[in-house]
Amino acid sequence: MKVLIASKSDPASMQMLSYLEDNYDIKENSGRRFVKDFEIFVIEDRHIFHDMNLGNNYEYAVVLSRHSSAADIKSLTAHPTGNFGPKADLGGRPKTINVSCPKYMSGTLRQMLESYSGTKFQVTFEATHHGPIFDLPNYYVEIGTTENEWTDDDAKKTAVDAVINPDAKDFPNFVAVGGGHYAPKILEYFRRNEINIGHIISKHDHDDLEEWQIKDAVEKTPSCKGFLVDRKGTRSRVRDMVKSISDDLGLELIMI
């Protein structure tokens, strides 16, 4: 069993939940609601500040969320959670990341890429960022960036259908390093190769990044096979740390 989380404080989250309720067979049992192999949780407060203690009866969790972008990028995104940096302004804890969910996060993004045929939205990963704290593997699926997009029928269908029926593959799992927040080179490699992505360490987190945090990203990317590194989008000292860790742990190192 998996968990699907929506927040009443997030308009995009509730729009996606409404699409789910209108288009899928929701089962109820003793006050609990289920769709396929997901249990549905609806919380009152904003999910990024709502630390999750769900127990060990679930395989992973997906949070339905809005995406905000100062650049007004219209997007459908998937990303891991946690903070590599020294601040936690958007939930979670400083320098603390959750266990990622590479098979199903990648499967969800792969399905969105396959099913979305429009031109309005950019379908992409985001780097690991924001809370909450989770006690099981998890990822976010987001629609950005204004109410016009949050209520878009194609966006809701693409996102929710991909969460419920991800194109999940048993490909090798990698930690991605480098590039900007949307990791375009990582995304392009992902689209052309049989690979799953776990944590994504953006170049914006490289100034304060410590070696133990890179090892932590490996440990919190289940069955991690290696690193996928955007060479030009990675600080040289971070490249050196990644190389050293990959050598020490016998991990594959792919430079792009």
From Swiss-Prot:
Keywords: Hydrolase, Metal-binding, Zinc
Key word Hydrolase present: yes
Origin superkingdom: Archaea
Swiss-Prot/TrEMBL catalytic activity: a D-aminoacyl-tRNA + H2O = a tRNA + a D-alpha-amino acid + H(+); glycyl-tRNA(Ala) + H2O = tRNA(Ala) + glycine + H(+)
Cofactor annotation remark: Binds 2 Zn(2+) ions per subunit.
HAMAP family from the UniProt entry: Deacylase_DtdA (MF_00562)
Membership in a protein family: Belongs to the DtdA deacylase family.
Protein name (record): D-aminoacyl-tRNA deacylase
Organism field: Thermoplasma volcanium (strain ATCC 51530 / DSM 4299 / JCM 9571 / NBRC 15438 / GSS1)
Lineage: Archaea, Methanobacteriati, Thermoplasmatota, Thermoplasmata, Thermoplasmatales
